[in-house]
Amino acid sequence: MLGLIGASQADRVEMAMTYSDSDGLIRRRSGWMIPLGVFLVTFVLSALLLIYYLAPSAPNFLEEQVSPTSRTDLVALRVHGLKLWIPANYLQYASSRRGGAFKDVAMFALLPDLSGWSDDDAPSFSGNTADSPVVYLLIREERLNLTEADRLARIYMAHVADNKGTAGPFGLTQYAFRDDTGYRNEDLFVGQTPTGPQLLRCVRFSPRVPSPSCLRDTPIAHDVALSYRFKRAHLAEWRQIGQAIGRLVARFKEEPRENALQGEQRRR
């Protein structure tokens, strides 16, 4: 009996020692596992941040890529109720060539005759030299659809260094935007035409911008505006470019004969 009691006590002592040893081992492991876990999490997060900021960014595949075509069939489009019939080779994106209603329609054309994209002219359309002949056009919805005269008086005059301007090149009046405005590093050129002033914002030449562009923004319908840009090297042709684009947009607004449009649709 005493032997059994002794054995039982010995077992309890052994068990106590075992649990005590295990508990100490768990405590010892806990002491270095928690800092190790914190270190590993911090290391992984730091590595991910470095990869995010330093790795080259991949193209955003959610944004549609320009995909020109040499097709010339007419595409029926609408921008805020304005109906347009535009040859497919003027449209930059395949989605717009499906036709229908859009908030904006992006196009391009080639100076001097504002021709659409073609296989032969593909190198010219893809270039970005200082004298590139490409003109980019955008017809879009515009709630604040100011005339160019209103835009000059209500927006730009508050941001120029001298409201009087100076005599600029090519029959234009030139204004310099102040450095404390969002238009810094740009010049404003105003030309007078029979239909009112024509405004062109042109980025200045600089080592960082060796091939700057000029931008014009003008209303073409109720709540619909047209903007187009061309290289500043072609500023001497501002009047001819404006007239040619006016004729081009008027052509886009012309509704084709029904049988002609049906014939174009059959050829797609």
Q: Where are these predicted regions, by residue range?
A:
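Ser/Thr/Pro/Gly-rich low-complexity linker/stalk segments immediately outside membranes or between
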Residues: 54-74
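A mature extracytoplasmic/lumenal domain signature
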Residues: 90, 204-206, 230-232
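Hydrophobic membrane-insertion alpha-helices, especially the h-region
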Residues: 35-56
